[in-house]
A protein has these predicted regions:
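ALDH superfamily catalytic-core signature
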Residues: 231-376, 439, 486-489
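Rossmann-like NAD(P) dinucleotide-binding subdomain of oxidoreductase/dehydrogenase enzymes
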Residues: 124-267, 396
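Hydrophobic face of amphipathic alpha-helices that form TPR/SEL1-like repeat modules
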Residues: 1-28, 54
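Residue-level signal for inorganic ion chemistry
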Residues: 30, 68, 90, 112, ...
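A short hydrophobic/small-residue beta-strand
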Residues: 171-173, 349, 436
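Structural signal for hydrophobic packing residues in well-ordered secondary-structure cores
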Residues: 55, 59, 76-83, 87, ...
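Glycine-rich loop-to-alpha-helix module at the N-terminal edge of alpha/beta enzyme cores
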Residues: 31-122
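Conserved C-terminal structural/oligomerization subdomain of aldehyde/semialdehyde dehydrogenase
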Residues: 29-35, 221, 258, 312, ...
Length: 491
C-alpha cells in the first residue's frame, strides 16, 4: 500500500486535521489500493476559508475569462497526456471495464475543453427600455461553491461540475465519493500542475454524513451541486435552507426503454442490453424498465435473454470483458436483496439472479446480468432504483398504454423509445415526463447538451450552457444616459 493520499486545500497537500484515514478497495479482488485522508467538518471549514480568500481577495476572483480558458485548456491537455494512467486508476478504484474508463477519460478532456471555450462567449443581454435609460444584464460567478459526486463515474462526474464551476469564475470545494477518491486525487494533481491559483480548487475527502453534510449546511458556501441518490438529495435540500444557498441536484432514476412492434428488433435488443447492463447497471439513467409491445414481447425476450447469457463478466482489465465488478460488497448485497424481492413478488426470473464466484470472480463483487418478466407496476423491482444489472420487463398494448406505464414512476430522469415510425416516436417522447430522451438509441451523452431530470430525479441541469448558468448569478445594470435630478420631490 502506498503513502496516504492527501487532500488539496489552499494549494497545499494536507492530511485530515483529525489524522484519520480510509482505505480504498479494488472491488474486483478486494485489494487495498491506497489509504486516503478522511476529512471532517473542520476540513471543510478550512477549505471554505481558502476559497473565500481566493475569490474575494486573491487572484481567482479577478482572473479574466481568457486566462480561465487557458488554464482549462491546459488541464484538458494534461488529462489527455495522462489518459492511460487515469483510465487504469479509475478501473481499479471503481471496478468497471477498462474500455469504459478509457471513454470516460476521453469525455473528461472533452468536457474541460468545451467549458474552456465557453468562458469567453457572450453571456449578457441588453434590453430596449424607455429613454433615457439603458438596461443590460451580466452573468457573474456565485462565489464559493460545493461539489459532491457519486462513485459510478468518479472522474467524469467530477468534471461535469468542476469544469463549469471554474469556467464561470467560482472557487470550489470538491468532495468525491468515499468509495472512489483516487482519480479525484490525480485530477487535482493535474489542476495544480496546470497552474490554477491556490484556493481556487480545493479537494476534501470524507464521508457524506460529515464532509457532505457540512458542505450542504455551511453558511459561506453559496451553492451546492450534488449527484447521487434521491434520499440524500432531499437531505441536502433541507440543509441548504440555512443560508438559502443555490442547489442543483441530479438524483435517481427508474428509466423506461420502450420498444414498439415496428422497431428494428435486433438493433433494439442490442440497445436494450446496453441501456441496462453498461457499467453493471450502476447508471442513474439506466434503462432498468423495458416496456415491450405485447405482439413482440415473447420473441424479443427470447433474443434478449440469449444475448444476456453471453455477456462476459470479468475483472475490468480482462480480455473481452463486457461487465465487471459492482462497486462494493455492501452494494452487491443490496442488489442481490432486490433480486430476492423480485422473486417473492411473483416476477419470473429468466436469467442471472446470482453472485458470480467462479475462479477469480470469487475475490470480487460480481453479479450476473439479471432479467425479470411477468412484472406488474406495483412491484418494488419496477418502482425502486436498484442501481445494478437487474432488468424488469413490462408489456404494453398501444401507444397510450406505453405512455401511461413509462410515466408511472416518481422519477423522470431519462427514457428511450424504439420505432421505425418517426411521428410515433416523437409523439411518445413529447408525452414522456423525463429530462433526457433518446429515439432509436440509449445513453449517448454530450458535453454540449443539458443533463438532468423531472420529478424526483432532481433540480437544475449539468452540461451545456445550462450547466454553466447553474454556477452564475444574473446582475441587472441600469444606466441613465441623461444624468440629472429625478425631480420627484418639489422641496
Amino acid at each position: 500500500m502506498s503513502d496516504v493520499k492527501k487532500m488539496f486545500i489552499n494549494g497545499q497537500w494536507v492530511e485530515a486535521l483529525s489524522g484519520e484515514t480510509r482505505e480504498s478497495i479494488n472491488p474486483a479482488n478486494g485489494e487495498v489500493l491506497a489509504a486516503v485522508a478522511e476529512g471532517s467538518a473542520a476540513d471543510v471549514d478550512k477549505a471554505v476559508e481558502a476559497a473565500k480568500e481566493a475569490f474575494y481577495n486573491g487572484p481567482w476572483g479577478s482572473t479574466p475569462a481568457q486566462e480561465r480558458a487557458a488554464l482549462l485548456f491546459k488541464l484538458a491537455d494534461l488529462v489527455d497526456a495522462n489518459a492511460g494512467e487515469l483510465a487504469e486508476l479509475e478501473m481499479r478504484d471503481n471496478g468497471k471495464p477498462l474500455r469504459e474508463t478509457k471513454y470516460d477519460v476521453a469525455d473528461t478532456a472533452a468536457c474541460f475543453r468545451y467549458y474552456a471555450g465557453l468562458c469567453t462567449k457572450p453571456m449578457g443581454q441588453t434590453y430596449e427600455v424607455a429613454d433615457p435609460m439603458q438596461a443590460m444584464t451580466v452573468r457573474e460567478p456565485i462565489g464559493v461553491v460545493g461539489l459532491i459526486v457519486p462513485w459510478n463515474y468518479p472522474l467524469l462526474m467530477a468534471t461535469w461540475k468542476i469544469a463549469p464551476a471554474l469556467a464561470a469564475g467560482n472557487c470550489i470545494i470538491f468532495k468525491p465519493a468515499e468509495l472512489t477518491p483516487l482519480s479525484a486525487v490525480r485530477l487535482f494533481e493535474l489542476i495544480e500542475a496546470a497552474g490554477f491559483p491556490k484556493g481556487s480548487a480545493n479537494l476534501v475527502m470524507g464521508a457524506g454524513a460529515s464532509v457532505g453534510a457540512r458542505m450542504a449546511e455551511h453558511p459561506e458556501i453559496e451553492k451546492i451541486a450534488f449527484t447521487g441518490g434521491t434520499e440524500t438529495g432531499r437531505k441536502i435540500m433541507m440543509a441548504a435552507t440555512g443560508n438559502l444557498k443555490k442547489i442543483s441536484l441530479e438524483l435517481g432514476g427508474k428509466s423506461p426503454c420502450v420498444v414498439f412492434e415496428d422497431a428494428d428488433m435486433d438493433a433494439a435488443v442490442d440497445w436494450a442490453l446496453f441501456a441496462i447492463f453498461a457499467n453493471q447497471g450502476q447508471v442513474c439513467s439506466a434503462g432498468s424498465r423495458l416496456l415491450l409491445q405485447e405482439s413482440i414481447h415473447d420473441e424479443f425476450v427470447e433474443k434478449l435473454v440469449a444475448r444476456a447469457k453471453q455477456i462476459k463478466v470479468a475483472p475490468g482489465d480482462a480480455e473481452g470483458v463486457e461487465m465487471a465488478a459492482m462497486i462494493s460488497e455492501a452494494h452487491m448485497e443490496k442488489v442481490l436483496k432486490y433480486i430476492e424481492i423480485g422473486k417473492e413478488e411473483g416476477a419470473t426470473l429468466l436469467c442471472g439472479g446470482e453472485r458470480l464466484t467462479d475462479g477469480e470472480l470469487g475475490k470480487g463483487f460480481f453479479v450476473a446480468p439479471t432479467i425479470f418478466t411477468d412484472t406488474t407496476p406495483d412491484m418494488r423491482i419496477v418502482q425502486e432504483e436498484i442501481f445494478g444489472p437487474v432488468l424488469a420487463v413490462q408489456k404494453f398494448t398501444d401507444d397510450e398504454d406505453a405512455v401511461r406505464l413509462a410515466n408511472d414512476s416518481i422519477y423522470g430522469l431519462a427514457g428511450g423509445v424504439f420505432s421505425e415510425n418517426g411521428t410515433r416516436a416523437m409523439k411518445f417522447i413529447k408525452k414522456l415526463r423525463a429530462g433526457i430522451t433518446w429515439i432509436n438509441c440509449y445513453h449517448p451523452t454530450y458535453s454540449e447538451a443539458p443533463w438532468g431530470g423531472y420529478k424526483q430525479s432532481g433540480i437544475g441541469r449539468d452540461l451545456g450552457t445550462y450547466g454553466f448558468d447553474e454556477y452564475t448569478e444574473v446582475k441587472q445594470i441600469n444606466i441613465n444616459l441623461e444624468p440629472g435630478p429625478v425631480g420627484w420631490f418639489e422641496g
